[in-house]
Amino acid sequence: MTSVHTLPDITATPAWDALRKHHDRIGDTHLRQFFEEDPDRGRELTVTVGDLYIDYSKHRVTRETLRLLVDLARTAKLEERRDQMFAGVHINTSEDRAVLHTALRLPRDAELIVDGRNVVADVHEVLDAMGEFTDRLRSGEWTGATGKRISTVVNIGIGGSDLGPVMVYQALRHYADAGISARFVSNVDPADLIATLADLDPATTLFIVASKTFSTLETLTNATAARRWITDALGDAAVAHHFVAVSTNKRLVDDFGINTDNMFGFWDWVGGRYSVDSAIGLSVMAVIGREAFADFLSGFHIVDRHFQTAPLESNAPVLLGLIGLWYSNFMGAQSRAVLPYSNDLARFAAYLQQLTMESNGKSTRADGSPVTTDTGEIFWGEPGTNGQHAFYQLLHQGTRLVPADFIGFSQPIDDLPTAEGSGSMHDLLMSNFFAQTQVLAFGKTAEEIAAEGTPADIVPHKVMPGNRPSTSILANRLTPSVLGQLIALYEHQVFTEGVIWGIDSFDQWGVELGKTQAKALLPVITANNSPAPQSDSSTDALVRRYRSERGRTS
C-alpha cells in the first residue's frame, strides 16, 4: 500500500481564511450589482475550450473571488497533483493504484510508461480489437447461431458499466449508421431484463456482459438469465455466438461459455465511473462505429490537454470546480442542477451523479483523518424545458441556493417548425435557455411588478428575487467530440474539488458494506425454516413481514 503523508488541513490555511473573510464582504451582493459595477463581465468572465463556450459571469463571484480561489488551489498543490495523475503516480492511495482514465484517449503515437508498461500501446491494442469486432458486427460478417445478422446489442452491466454507455448511446443516437440498436440492463429487479427482452428475437440479439471481475452479483444474475433466454430458444452452442464480455477474468468468462477471443479487457487504473471511453463503451462503438468512437475519444483529449496545460486562472475545469467549491463551502449550497437544453442529453445528469457523488462523497481524507468541511456536491437535473414545469419554481423562488449548469447547442440535429409554421422549435427551446439564466440571475423586483399594474396583494407572490447563479455552456452541435469534451470537463472538476478537500476521489468503499450485507441477508429471506433474528428490530420486522407475504415461515 502506498504510504500517505499526513495532509495539511486546507480549512486552517491563510488561503481558506482569506476566502471566508471575502465571503463576509461580498456574500450577500446581488448579481445585478456585480453587472452594474463590472459591465464587461458578461464578455470577459468566459472561457473557450475546444468547441465549448463557457460563460461563468452569472456566478456570485468577483475577479477577486476567482483570484482567491486560485490561491486556494495552489495552496492545495492542485498543479502538482494534476501532474502526478497524468504521469501515472498512484494517487488512488487507498487501493494503491494509478488513475489513468486520461490515457484511454491518448493518441496512438503517445507514450506513457506506468509500472514498466507503455499503457498507450495497451489501450490501442484493445481499441483495435474492439474496432475489428464491431466492424464484423456492423457489416453482418458476425452472425448469430442461425446465420441471421445481429440487429440489437444488449449491454448487461451496472454502475459505470451501465450509466456511461446508456447516456452516450442516447446522446449520439443520430450517429447510428449500421442498423444496430442498443439496449441496457442493469437492475437485478427482473422487470428490467424482462421488459428489455420482451420484443427481441434471440436469433438477432447479442449480449455484452460488462464486469471487470465477471463476478458482480447483479450483472452475473442478469447475464445468467439472458443466457437461459438464448439457450432455451437456440440451444447451448448458441452462447458463443450471442455473448461477448468486457472483463479481465478469462477463467470465469470461459466458464460462462464465452469465447475468450471475444473478451475485451481494461485495467485497474480505470474506475468504473471513468470507463465509458474504454472497452465499457463497446456497445456504443457497435452502434456508431469505430471512427465516430475515435472522435468521441478525441473530444476527451482536447479537454485533457487544456486541463493539463492551461494556467489555473484560465483553466475551465479548474475554474468551474473552484466555483462549485465556493458555493459548497462558503455559500451554503448543497446541490447543483444540471440542465441540458437537449433531450438527447436526458441521462447526462444521472451520469454525472455517479461521477461526482461516488468520487467526492467522502467524509475521510486520503490520509485517513476526518474531513473538516463539507465535501461532495449533490448533482441532479432534467432536460429543459421539462424541468421548467417541474422544479424550476424552487430554483426561482425557493429558500435554497441551487447553482445550475445550463448546456445548449446552436445548431440542432433535429428541428421542426413552430405552431404557426414559420419558426424553429429549436429557437424556441434556446430562447427558454437564455431566458432562464437571465431571470435566475436578475429576477424582477416588487417595484417593477407593481409598475405593470399588478394588484398590491399579488405583488409579493410574483417577486423574483434573482441572484440565483448559473453557468452557461454553449456548443455548436452535439457531436461525438463535443460529448467527450463535456464529460472530461466534469471529470476534471471532480478532481479539482477532491484535491482541495484532500480526499481520494477514485475509491468507493461506501458501496461495499451494503453489497456484503445483501449477500448475508439473501439466505435469511429465502430459507424455508424460521429466520434467525436480526441485530436490529426494524430489519427483523421487515424481513419477517416480507417472508410472510412471500408465503414463508416467519
Curated annotation (Swiss-Prot):
It comes from the Bacteria. Keywords: Cytoplasm, Gluconeogenesis, Glycolysis, Isomerase. The keyword Cell inner membrane does not apply. One of its GO terms (biological process) is glucose 6-phosphate metabolic process. Pathway: Carbohydrate biosynthesis; gluconeogenesis; Carbohydrate degradation; glycolysis; D-glyceraldehyde 3-phosphate and glycerone phosphate from D-glucose: step 2/4. Its EC number is 5.3.1.9. Residues 527-540 have a biased composition (Polar residues). One of its GO terms (molecular function) is monosaccharide binding. NCBIfam families: PRK00179.1. This is Glucose-6-phosphate isomerase. It comes from Mycolicibacterium paratuberculosis (strain ATCC BAA-968 / K-10).
